[in-house]
A protein has these predicted regions:
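Interdomain/boundary linker segments immediately adjacent to catalytic/signaling cores
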Residues: 2-3, 7, 11-74
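Non-catalytic C-terminal interaction segments of nucleic acid-processing enzymes
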Residues: 164-223
Length: 223
């Protein structure tokens, strides 16, 4: 009964955010909440690919960007573009993993799937460059400098032992590097996914906005 209530509560919160979005009044906070919800829905609805990725600690950014773009379109987003130029004006030549529009506002999403080295049953013991993985997320935040869009950084930390909180150190480090205050409550969702009949693992979905003010402090505009 406790689990059912918890699931209902999560669904209610996600639906509430979605209803607010449908009303056409969207803040950056609502946008990153909704993208985080979308990613959770995509991961939960594809147990086969996710189980393989978890067991092998294999990154899945390429698959995720197309799956997420498809999911966003199904939810009502428009002008979906994968590998979208961040700057329409051409000032910044970088590309985001995918972009979409809602109510005339463009959002650009940078995606990463950093894998961990933590040991857990049912997962191959493979070494992964954890420090490099999380440094790349900081770089994503630093390149999101544009007058033309609302940049969001999203990433999925995997695999994680069920209930483990060690991933919080990486969220705090990313926030420190990008001069942002990031928290579990506002920017992260921890979910459990099955990887075999006998084993499950957690993943953490994080998403946060990069304000233009922060981006301008972090990245000089190219001339």
């Amino acid at each position: 009964m406790g689990r059912s209530h918890q699931k209902s509560e999560k669904c209610y919160c996600a639906q509430a955010h979605h209803n607010n979005w449908l009303g056409g009044i969207v803040t950056m906070a609502q946008a990153h909440d909704i993208v985080r919800t979308w990613i959770s829905e995509v991961l939960r609805s594809h147990p086969g690919p996710m189980a393989i990725a978890m067991r092998q600690r294999a990154k899945f950014e390429g698959w995720l960007k197309f799956s997420l773009a498809t999911h966003a379109e199904l939810k009502g987003a428009t002008d979906i573009v994968v590998e979208a130029p961040i700057s329409v004006s051409g000032v910044n030549r970088a590309r985001s993993d995918f972009s979409f529009k809602w109510d005339g506002v463009r959002y650009d999403v940078e995606l990463k799937t950093p894998n961990t080295n933590w040991r857990m049953p049912g997962v191959a013991e493979l070494h992964r460059p954890v420090t490099k993985n999380f440094s790349s997320i900081v770089e994503d935040g630093r390149k999101a400098n544009s007058q033309d869009c609302q940049p969001l950084v999203a990433f999925v930390i995997f695999p994680i032992p069920i209930g483990d909180n060690r991933w919080l150190q990486y969220l705090e480090r990313i926030g420190h590097e990008l001069q942002l205050t990031l928290s579990r409550e506002a920017h992260a969702t921890q979910i459990t996914l099955p990887i075999s009949p006998a084993h499950s693992v957690d993943v953490v979905i994080c998403c946060f906005p990069i304000s233009l003010r922060v981006a301008e402090q972090l990245v000089p505009i190219a001339v």
